Amino acid sequence: MQNGTTIGIPPENERVTERAEPVPSDLLPNNSPVNSPTIDPTLSEIKDVAADHNEEPPSKRRKVAGSTPSRRSHSRAASPPWKKAGADGPTSKIVDGKRRSTRVSNVGPVEQPPSDAKPTRSSQKQYVSKAVSSQRNAAVSSPLPMSPSRSGINRRSLAGVAVNGSPSTTAKGSIGRRRRESPSPVSKRASTRTRPDNMDAYHPSNGVTPRSNSTKTRSTRSFQLASSDFREETADDIGNDGQDEHGQRIQRLRIKVKKPALSIQHPSHVLPTRKYGSFKEWLENEGTGPGRMLTMTDALEEAQKRRQVTEAMEPGGLLSSEVCSAFLPEPQEELPQQFSHQDHLVAHALYFKKLLDKEHRAHRQAAKSLAAACAEVWRKRNKDPEDILREQQEEMRGKRKQLAKDLKKMFELARAEIDRVRLARWEEEQKAKDQRALDRAIKQSTMLFEKRRLEILGETGSDAPETTTDDEEVETDNGSENDDEEGESNMSTETEEEDGDDRDDDVGLTAEELRLKYANLPDTNPHPDQSPYSDEDSEDSDDIAADNTPGDTSGGVNRSPPPDSSGQVELDEVDPVLIDDSDESTDMDDDMGDSDDDGYSEAESDDEDGGEPGLLGFFSAKDLSLSNLHQTNSGEGDTHQTGADGDRNEDSSFDESEFGSEDPDEVTLVPTGPTNKDLSTPATVTASAELEPAAMTPSIDQTSTEEPIAIGTETPIETVAEDAAALADTEPVDVDVLDTSTNDSVPPVMSPATNLLKQIERQQHEPYHSRAASSEASPGTVATKPSEPESVSSIEAPAEKHAQPSESPGPGLKTPIPHLLRGTLREYQHFGLDWLAGLYSNHINGILADEMGLGKTIQTIALLAHLAVEHGVWGPHLVVVPTSVILNWEMEFKKWCPGFKIMTYYGNQEERRQKRRGWMDDNSWNVLITSYQLVLQDQQVLKRRSWHYMILDEAHNIKNFRSQRWQALLTFRTRARLLLTGTPLQNNLTELWSLLFFLMPTDGDEAGIEGFADLRNFSEWFRRPVEQILEHGRETMDDEAKQVVTKLHTVLRPYILRRLKADVEKQMPGKYEHVVYCRLSKRQRYLYDGFMSRAQTKETLASGNYLSIINCLMQLRKVCNHPDLFETRPISTSFAMPRSVATEFETSEALVRRRLLYQHPLEKLDLDFLNLVPISREDISRRLADDSARIMAYAPFNTLRERQYHRTNWEMKFNGSTVQSTLEALENDCRKRRMAELERSLYFESKRHGRRPVYGSSLIEFLTADSKQRPTAHGPLRKRSYADWLSSQSSVLASMMMSLEERSQAMDGYIQRFACVTPAAVAAGVTEAALTPISTRHLTNKERFPPHDPFHEAQMRLSIAFPDKRLLQYDCGKLQRLDKLLRDLKAGGHRALIFTQMTKMLDVLEQFLNIHGHRYLRLDGTTKVEQRQILTDRFNNDNRILAFILSSRSGGLGINLTGADTVIFYDLDWNPAMDKQCQDRCHRIGQTRDVHIYRFVSEYTIESNILRKANQKRMLDDVVIQEGEFTTDYFTKLDVRDMIGNDEALKDEASAAMDRVLENRVTNTSRVFEQAEDKEDIDAAKNAQKELEHADDGDFDDRANANASGVTAASASASGAGQTPTQAGTPLPDEAQQSLNANNAEVAEDTADSDPSVGHIDDYLLRFMEWNMKDEPLVLPVDKSMKKSKKGKEHRLRKRRR
């Protein structure tokens, strides 16, 4: 391409990328000599041009005269990437920051000298060929073209420079101009974006790049590097003109070989264009500027011109002000003319002309259109064959294009549909996988719980007669010994099987086996959802029925292979705990000796110890090696024993590699139990053999333990098809092998069903047969694994045991109370100890979740004492508790178990360091008690120890698995773990998962440790009921959600023990909760509404930022608690101005006052002083004037004056020459001053006593007549008028006419109460400016303090207003309500605990209680550990203390405050479990009065929503935890008759209730859901329903056919496996869509095979696309929640990468 047009290249040959093609033979390099005269003129011409343009911009290329190159058969090579399609030279330049065109150059073209030869292309090629051949050894590249990668790199690097430096243009005008200016083929180049197909054909024949302008290029580049990047890039464009991109010129023009130039940062950086283009031009124009040298002639001419100008400026001249127009004033702007009629006429005429022109153009356009239409009609009528053919070709071409577009779109739609189907299939597989995982977890939990239950009910609840004889016992003993010696499994021997054939069929069967045996009776009710384990029951019953067919030789209990074929039959993934029914307290230490087996052989115990407990059924690959431990024949013992030893080795190696071998008692996070089988003693074997008949007696409902089911094998479990919930619980299991550890053999002949109930009743009423007293556990405790009655250290021979008295602790309990424990445990606490001991024996970690106040601490201490007494394990134990209860735990240990050595690990860093001295010694202490904070601080030190038992009190402190506490405590090396919490579920299921995963962690690898499920699976399992409870309440849960909740209970039941006070403590006082709604005060409502109306608040709430929203909600809660927490009531003061307005005029006022009042002292005389104002003395009486004149001392003063006058020397002057003269002069001066004083006193005395009135006051009073009564005047002096004075007195008038002091005292209360409004502003200096200043106040000794100012109180209260103390209460609605409540409680003799979350609110409550004079105590986070226990004891013992104010975060944990019977929650917690913790501080054991709980809630505020949210969380806790019945007496509610024979009654009753409530509503509800849901959701729901209803129809049909026709169970299992996929457990999506059940699917397949009709193209396209995409990985949808927020970055444009 050249300037966007093709030069000799057809359009179909245009390409953007290069295409490598072979070079034609005629274009190969030619090494023939070339004539040098043809080259010399061109070379000289180039040198001249380079010399002329060495320091100036390059000129444009011009056409060489007479150069008419021959047209080549191939196109030119593509232009270099930096060469644009515009003009050759720069098309623009930057001058003063503006872009200017360079097409018009100031420099003219340089004349080229004529050459003899024409510079044709061939001559240039020959010159280049010769130059290259002559310099072959120099730095010249080979003729071969550059590699594409290298050339591409060069193109990219140089292209960037060209784009950034020189803006090129591709306008059509420039293209045409270049065509006219440069028709020479030298300037023709292809565009950078086009590559012809025959690219190699454009290479020169000699194989190298032409170098016709190399000298010019170097000179130009040297100039451009000195100027700027812009000109540098321009030089690159010019210097590389016509170069091939495969040539060497690109490498030689790299900038790195030159000096780097500064980039243009400012327009001034661009060098200005030279004024003169050549030296000749400069010579011609030199001397014409203003600074040139003038000759004499020029100077004379200049002088003459200036003289003429000066003369013309004289008056009368041409340039004078009178003549020149430049001096005339500027003309006035004329007013615009008014739009007249003529203007209207002209405008109308112009508009009319415009209309005419428009009409004319329309006519012409219509004529053209008509002509074109006529021509088209004419052309269609007279078509040539060529035109017809061309039109058909065009039409076909258009159809082909449209067809291609349609096919492309159809393929895209098909691909999208296939992706959607694959994604839906993947989602269903994930759901099925999650469902299978849940089923495994439920199955595992059910089996584990059943095992614990059967350990109790199997020995204490079963009353079957002891049918075995002594011979059989001896035989059993021998069998057990043989098993121990030969390493056989825990199955019965062949001799026992033979003996078992002589017994009755039903006598040796357990209750569960009897129920399974007769499960296929016709009257069975198909509603197994009423029992928590009905799913498993129905499944097992079907399995037994199918396996016990007469023709089945491989199923049932008798299909175990002979001993010689033991290696061929294995069980996959069978957990050892599910097979072993041992109920003894297994020793958890490897070096503590043996464990007793109660009713089972030694091999059984070894099998249990060797395997890991399958926690919640999450099997890993490690369990595959355990499968050979549990077989159904005793002949397989060798193989089993080998597998067990292998597993033990693996476990031990894993422990050592994981944690090292620091402590021999050290184990992994999930303990694996004893690993040495050799620890068993002969005494244990004997005891096991002796107690084995007891285990062989029938027990109740032993589904889980009697029938170990391997998970993950090919045969699915049959379930009842009518129950959707039961179908949801199904999972693929292996039922080929049944455990017969309890019953040695099942006879093929079965007893009638009518004898079943009678036999059960007879067994129930028969007394227990005598066994070893210490080995027997009494009935009563269910759902609790009995621990071993005898400790490991006290094992005795069986003969001795028969002689010992019974040591059974009580009915239903197997764990005796350890003798180390001081005190008596309550019955439920003993059951809790038994449950904890069972957990320890089975290597299971658990949660003791008893309600607060039931003694979890005591049960934990009893457990540790049990370990010390029964197992000899004294520690070390780690107990982590909240800080507030560290000393409480220490006191409880010293009180209940003083035999333990306790270390309370707290204090500062130095104290803790002192406590750690020598603490590695196991004998220094047994139990370490510390807090969660110190565990985090000293975790590195604490992790060095290997802890036997780690106990976490208030375990909800680790409810967040992202917290440091959870992560730090998880990595501690412990043998067992126990969590104590009264609130296992606080906010959501994630917190419950955190606790369970902490107990049963997993390493995340399928081949690693078995642990609990991950968070995603756990959340997916139980998401539906949680959402329904939180959104609509527990009443709106559908059946599926209720079934999911039941499954959750099943999963959690083996690991949680939860008892409520109402269940275990019947004598506990009642608890009553009250919600007190408080109205907001006026100030609270003002602040609340003001904060909500802020724009910032609305923006924050709408932003979605979690922390910002929480901050806003916290501010609102502060307003609800007390407005002072949000905004403190200020001390109201007026705005103090720095100075008043009058103060500014103080100086002027003083100056004016001074000038106005200034006068000479003699100008104005005091006439009054001179007695010249006679009437001014009328205020004195005549008598006083006479007395004053009589005592006048004028004569004595005059005598003294005369004497002093004669003593004074008036002519003496100061003489300081001598001391004597100086003293005399000073004495004389004193006499002069004394003389002046006497003269002044004489003067004043004469004037003072000369004051005489004209009339006198006595005369005036005597002559004045006062007609008004004076009732308040003083009493008369004469007694005779005293009665008249009293009669005229009035007390009312006297009280009304009070003095100023009396009035101020009377109004003092009003001033204190109501003087609160201060002026808006005050200014200093106003008083001085308005009033006359007081000069001096003299205070005598009697007046040390100024007199009382009656206005002082009012002035202070009106100038600064302190808030009234009573406003603390009246500003808050809650405090007003609290005041009334506390008065009522105090009157009734009650005491209260006041909880709040905010520490500042505690300060407000303190002020409130101090105002009202109530006694109180305070406890918050700043209270020291030692002080907390003192405060608790003081409150419980001192009844005078009315209230205890506490922080719910610190005072609500672990302390005992039974002295109070009222709990007041001043504010609500987000977490209702925290409030429950707080209220149970007083509602606990030891409380004798009813407890009332008051919750203060502000109306119409955020607190109402908090209360609603807390109620939702409480409902979730009730559904998940409370209704789970995680108690030890759970199974006592189930009667034996109900579990065995009365299933039908349960199912009927439940089914009737369900039908009455949900018969019609379910259908209608589903239809409503279908109307509201999307089509995809409806289809998915239908598919799931089909799977639930028809997934196992084929299995049931096959098994039914097998029972009828006598086919084997193996064939039935194979057919069933063929119907249901092994891995998914549910039909595939396409199978579910094609058929409703397996039979319909087969019919549909047969019909499809026999139908010869052709399918639709869409189906074929979908199948083809699915086949085509089978190897492509499925692209999962992006999780939008994980995408980073791009808020605020929308304005940033994404840069394109080149």
Swiss-Prot record:
This protein's GO cellular component annotations are: Swr1 complex
UniProt keyword terms in alphabetical order: Activator, ATP-binding, Chromatin regulator, DNA-binding, Helicase, Hydrolase, Nucleotide-binding, Nucleus, Transcription, Transcription regulation
Give positions of region: Disordered: 1-249, 456-682, 763-818, 1586-1632, 1673-1698
Bias kind Polar residues: ranges: 28-41, 120-140, 625-642, 673-682
Query: Compositionally biased, Acidic residues: which spans?
Result: 468-507, 534-545, 570-611, 652-666
Domain of life, per the record?
Answer: Eukaryota
Chain ranges of the Helicase ATP-binding domain: 837-1002
Sequence ranges assigned to domain HSA in this UniProt record: 329-403
Protein EC: 3.6.4.12
Motif DEAH box location, chain numbering: 953-956
- Record's keyword annotation contains Glycoprotein: no
Give residue spans, biased composition: Basic residues: 1683-1698
Bias type Basic and acidic residues, positions? 12-21, 45-59, 1586-1600
Matches recorded under Gene3D superfamilies: P-loop containing nucleotide triphosphate hydrolases, SWI2/SNF2 ATPases, N-terminal domain, Tandem AAA-ATPase domain
Q: Which GO terms describe its biological process?
A: chromatin remodeling
Broad enzyme group: hydrolase
Which compartment or compartments is the protein found in? Nucleus
Q: Which GO terms describe its molecular function?
A: ATP binding; ATP hydrolysis activity; DNA binding; helicase activity; histone binding
SMART domains in alphabetical order: DEXDc (SM00487), HELICc (SM00490)
Residue positions binding ATP: D850, E851, M852, G853, L854, G855, K856, T857
Q: Which SUPFAM superfamilies match?
A: P-loop containing nucleoside triphosphate hydrolases
Domain Helicase C-terminal residues, every copy: 1377-1527
Task performed by this protein: Catalytic component of the SWR1 complex which mediates the ATP-dependent exchange of histone H2A for the H2A variant HZT1 leading to transcriptional regulation of selected genes by chromatin remodeling.
Family recorded in the similarity comment: Belongs to the SNF2/RAD54 helicase family. SWR1 subfamily.
Assembly and partners?
Component of the SWR1 chromatin-remodeling complex.
Q: What is this protein called?
A: Helicase swr1
Organism from which the protein derives:
Emericella nidulans (strain FGSC A4 / ATCC 38163 / CBS 112.46 / NRRL 194 / M139) (Aspergillus nidulans)
